[in-house]
Amino acid sequence: MNIKIVFPKHSQPDIAKATIAERLCQVASLCLNLPDYIEVHFANLGPGTYGEAILKPGINRVITVNLDLSVKEIIYPITHELIHLSQMYEGKLAISRTGLYVWEGKTYQVDPAKISYKEYMNLPWESDVTLRQKTLIEQIIG
């Protein structure tokens, strides 16, 4: 697996975060069906956003993690987004820029800004992550 870690141009790369991110991706690839190439970007996502995943045709296989999180805090969002990346890579989940989500063939129109966190976390692709994440973290950390 090829992993590229990217930090904003104006900030000094955090070697500890880069190392943790790379190791999480490597070990997760043994447990999840993931693309051969993944980029992990650290960026200023603002308060309340921990991370996001993007999988587009071609080479865009990107997980973005909030730069403000500590080394310990990045474990949860990276594993969460790796599961989403796996869902997309396997064809279970597709997300459009217009707020359309397709989960296992069923289309959902979702505006995360207009629903509660609890409602969002009960969406089927988020429920799938919730079911799988604890086990994945245990497998990674040991």
Task: Give a label for each model feature.
Residues M1-S11, L32, I38-T49:
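Hydrophobic or amphipathic, alpha-helical segments that drive membrane association/targeting
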Residues P13-D36:
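Zn2+-dependent metallopeptidase catalytic core
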Residues A16-A21, I75, M121, W125-D128:
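Hydrophobic (often cysteine-bearing) scaffold residues that line and stabilize catalytic clefts
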Residues L32-I38, G46, K92-G142:
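Metalloprotease/metallohydrolase-associated module, dominated by Zn2+-dependent proteases
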Residues E73-E81:
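Short alpha-helical catalytic segment bearing the HExxH-like zincin motif
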Residues M1-I20, A113, G142:
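N-terminal intrinsically disordered, low-complexity tails enriched in polar/charged
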